[in-house]
């Protein structure tokens, strides 16, 4: 009856502590016969018993649901461990993963976990929390309450022996074959006897070893639970007034008068529960049975003796009329004693596990604060001394042999060299009047001869507006064309411009640059326009994208290129002399490069008033752009679309059979979750193929992993019939030559299926597409100013994106659009995308700004954008560029920054390349940088583990993901050079490499080689990949290569530290934390150092940290020699020297502190200065032109450095245990 009243009260929301039970749970609360149906605490009041009555036996089916309460965590502080222990003890297994399945559902604010329990009965419980780990613990606590109600736990949550669990399970009807041979009962955790006089909480009596199963949590749980390293935790406890706990001065035996016991019981009304929880938390045990034992004697008056074996043997005696009363009084006396020792907080609640192990934490923290000892072999020390005596640092700084000041510093700014022709890339020379007249007449003749081809071109909606458009462009410096999808603006307007100029006899003056947001659209549109102009004028149309270029002839030229290419052209021709028009297509996408380009083009109007700017968009906020350019005219052009029939999620589920996807339907109808069901996508594509109209299928997916996932599912489903389908992935990871296949017409009887990101959303037309499957999602980079890391998130697209995607189905015939989201979601979508400039890191943008307009501050320059970024974000970018030595304190480019300006990649990677040229290990760094731009491995959701194993094998014992890249690419180059086709395919298959990505990487290496040559770092581009070239003299020195990479990426440095404390207060001494300058991070399982059982060095470098689900983690890392960190990083060092021993540390970071004898430390400091001098010399002069004597000095210095880094790390070893 009490249970029924409780359920009714809960359903009515009376209890503030427990959530209402699910309807399926009500009426199924009876326990099995012979088992206790309650989990009430000893000696509680009747009201408390009614309020806390436990649920009974699970229902007969698999659907019983019980919602967890946060308060249950007080009763079951380590619920997941307790559940594992019960099932493990009962079944004789080491882990209960198969019997406990956690299913996660991500809500907009709360995480939900449904825990499926498969023993002793199938039952489900639910938990909620702001983090996944919190929700799991809530669900596990609810399950523990069930277990206790079923009699599977004792009154104090203690476990039974395996034999008793066998009897209990028989009553539940558990099948006999699920029982394994039971293991003998084991004590919870070992402990040591201590004298109470010496007790310090967390001291020797506090157990420092965590329970094994808690240490071996799943990796995703580790990501969610949050960690604090030992040093950070100790600094927090010093600020906590409760941290300094008192020593014990009591004896080992206590027996007081009854009044004292009664007062203690008043203060601790549930003392036995409190004692059990304290011991369980302190000892990481699932039971306190073996550490607190009662012995009660007597008839009328009961005398109870409590022997407490933690934190040391203590005995408490009390009396009472009943056994329970006497035991509670003794337990209350024990609680009073623990509180006097500081082992219970002021609210009479247990402390955290870490606080009970505070002495061990302090000892570990002290170990971490000690500097690491360095021992350099005596022969190397003597070599360093000899070198420094021969080439003293201070006198060399002022040597006149190089005359490093004034005019002899290389002029690498924007004013260096002749202007470049933006169309052809050759030096710009204006046409003479005679040349212009001759070329214009030739173009007119060619135009007249092209008649039949022009007639074949279909009439497009933009054609009737030609005069309006052309007159507006002629009369206004800027014009915005708002052309609907399908109006023909992308292909036709450049031709209309060329036609007017040619037919008016001034065709040589028409040189149009048309930007496209992506490489594939620039190439495909150029080819389309070239075809429409016909063979006579085909050579007047060209394209230029990264790694591929086919420029048009000079005069009367149409050049299609990406925005990045035009930005590069502006460096060598700031006023775009020789260009008549710039057409910016698809400006509504608001990528960061386009917004940056608009700043430059707006300022360019003063330098080149004859230049005409045309902005084109289908769905953008065109009035905003008009206002940005001073109210320029907006010309609206209607488009033409064939009818497109739309289906939304509810329609799609009805077609496929709604019962097959209950979770998907419920999920989208009720939540804002951005999760894509790849099985649903696959089934929809197969359904369209089986029942839909003939024609191609274009499927929009968020990213590469989803593309590969759907591709593999389709291939498996199609099986033997795969030859009847052409499945084509489209992604920026794929080289242009492979992407062009999407435009080809498949053979008769073959259906084309294109799996693409938003790369296929605009500018390109795939003629045979009839069906569009729109996931409604895309990847979007977002920058967290607080953590200073980026997060590539899957988010909903905007309504403008939905319109564009739908339009791909109706370009050439009627079509169908299948939206994998409900109609209600469409209304919630933003009208336009958030501009990229507002949500991404700005280092590249600031560097570009300093190249184009060095006289302006970064904030001043970027304030002129259509949407100005956060000033704090700009300042952070400036600070980073100053930290890596690219900008000085006045925000001018340094000599290093001028070199970086030539290299088209992230500033830190560009710095690594520059340093690699100076340190003569260039080729491996070019490979690393290229692979960080494009992953060479053929990785997918299904084969990640296999790829990780291959990377580990390729890395050997280098401890480096980056050197795994080098070995993979070098092996491929070797196979290409000497082996046949079969050997090449075997190499790709064995090493899980992706041939198109390797081709792209090869192209990047070639491009970087050209950049390095332009930066005066090598004598000729081919030297960069030539093993015998001076720039590769030390390319086989792995520690040097990793050190140079670290020097480029610094301050991206990680120090590995032993021991951590979870956010829940659990101390894990055998785990490791990864500390950076900004705080703790996690290593992703994809880096080989995540699973390494032994690290040769405590220091790692990395390129990028990414934020996911509230945690920051690193995907790529390399172990680096501590001496490389000391010698190759920027900034100053700090030395403390007592004349015998000295410590040296980085002034800008607490991540490196080394100790050695005074002579060793002094020599290392001088060696560091010599290396800094070498870098500065090399940056101030053409590297290949340095005098022979300087080349010789640098060669000796690098040989010495390589030998030093070959030495062992010695005391820097860190052993990782299996519980990490």
From Swiss-Prot:
It comes from the Eukaryota. Residues 79-147 form the DRBM domain. One of its GO terms (cellular component) is mitochondrion. A motif (DEAH box) lies at residues 585-588. One of its GO terms (biological process) is central nervous system development. Residues 214-226 have a biased composition (Acidic residues). Gene3D superfamilies: 1.20.120.1080, 3.30.160.20, P-loop containing nucleotide triphosphate hydrolases (3.40.50.300). PROSITE patterns: HELICASE_ATP_BIND_1, HELICASE_CTER. GO terms for molecular function: ATP binding; ATP hydrolysis activity; chromatin binding; DNA helicase activity; G-quadruplex RNA binding; RNA binding; RNA helicase activity. The keyword Nucleotide-binding applies. CDD domains: DEXHc_DHX30, SF2_C_RHA. Residues 470-638 form the Helicase ATP-binding domain. Belongs to the DEAD box helicase family. DEAH subfamily. This is ATP-dependent RNA helicase DHX30. The lineage of its organism: Eukaryota, Metazoa, Chordata, Craniata, Vertebrata.
